[in-house]
């Protein structure tokens, strides 16, 4: 069987069949195809958005009280004063990536308390 024949056979498979094929390949070769599974879920539609478990916290704007915002950014990120100030001055900037929904919402609330605008993506 040639590479082209294999690709053609894969093109003709349903999403369910492709999922089973990926699992079989993972077991056979002892590898993980996590990125391929995520890509397959995105093709399926809105289900991927509902299953999202990691979120990014983005500082959209610092508001009027930059000093307090810088302090909160330092607390959230663990960065030094200079780095935190650069993030606040350069908003919109991503503060944290790949955090849980609860953690992301807590960060957003802390930023809102000091007048900043943050987004959870």
Swiss-Prot record:
InterPro entries referenced in this protein's UniProt entry, alphabetically: Ribosomal_bL12, Ribosomal_bL12_C, Ribosomal_bL12_C/ClpS-like, Ribosomal_bL12_oligo, Ribosomal_bL12_oligo_N_sf
Any one annotated GO CC term: cytosolic large ribosomal subunit
Gene Ontology process terms (BP): translation
GO terms of molecular function: mRNA binding; structural constituent of ribosome
Pfam (any one): Ribosomal_L12_N
Keyword annotations of the record: Ribonucleoprotein, Ribosomal protein
SUPFAM superfamilies attached to this UniProt entry: ClpS-like, Ribosomal protein L7/12, oligomerisation (N-terminal) domain
Keyword field contains Metal-binding: no
Statement: the UniProt record of this protein carries the keyword Secreted: no
Similarity section: Belongs to the bacterial ribosomal protein bL12 family.
Functional note: Forms part of the ribosomal stalk which helps the ribosome interact with GTP-bound translation factors. Is thus essential for accurate translation.
Subunit record text: Homodimer. Part of the ribosomal stalk of the 50S ribosomal subunit. Forms a multimeric L10(L12)X complex, where L10 forms an elongated spine to which 2 to 4 L12 dimers bind in a sequential fashion. Binds GTP-bound translation factors.
PANTHER family: 39S RIBOSOMAL PROTEIN L12, LARGE RIBOSOMAL SUBUNIT PROTEIN BL12M
Protein name per the record: Large ribosomal subunit protein bL12
Taxonomic lineage of the native organism: Bacteria, Bacillati, Bacillota, Clostridia, Eubacteriales
